[in-house]
Amino acid sequence: MASDKEYLDFILDQLSDLDDIGYRDMMGEYIIYYRGKIVGGIYDNRMLVKPTSSAVAYMPTADRELPYDGAKEMLLVEDVDNREFLNGLFNAMYDDLPAPKKKK
């Protein structure tokens, strides 16, 4: 099931206090970038983030879910209505995220 553009717009609005938030459409789902690094994505209208050590510490009781069959588990962000929480989560995760891959 593809994610709704309206849900993407809601999440982007929640993250609008952060600099350099971007996204990429990927087969009906959306990859979310923060300052050039992949933080997570929107899958089936669920906000999922990479399970970095800082994300796990920030959301110790978060459920782990698969974004799609065959993928690695990610953390479900349930408190998407809380703008301050989301911004804090992305800032906490940033240093743990791998650098973007160089384009060939």
Give the residues covered by each predicted segment.
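Charge-dense, helix-prone N-terminal extensions
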Residues: M1-K104
